[in-house]
Amino acid sequence: MKKIFKKLFAKNRIDLIQQNLKVNNPNILEIGIHRGDFSKQLILKFNPKKLYLVDPWIAYNDFVYKNSWYGNSDKSNQKIQDKYYLDLLKYFEKYIYEKRVEVHRKTSDEFFLTNENIFDLIYIDGNHLFEFVKRDILNSLKFITEDGIIVLDD
């Protein structure tokens, strides 16, 4: 399997992916969904064969997150996280019924333990702590197609 690491630039995430994705109707894995805004763009722009969405939708209140984008906000409230999850299920209801979207309410580590699929695109925007990002990258490398791309967000 050929691995090429490069830093690419585009005016936005969708353009970056369009410039580099070499397959139509890709299998896509998105790690870190939050409210699903980017997930909605992925389904509309790429018409994936299947879109896998992975997020635990858990409110972390640890001091580690206190000064992060995630801490001290609605993102650290479990009721809000539950609402985000339910809203996402409602939005993707048709796609879930058609078996074009799978929503996994679990950590990416838990997802990868039982995953048997390979992906043309893996978009990583999960837990931003170094050890989690590192694991997401290492796990993703095991499940990406030869011409697939892995995109890291912030």
Predicted regions: what they are:
Residues 2-5, 14-154:
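S-adenosylmethionine/decaboxylated-SAM
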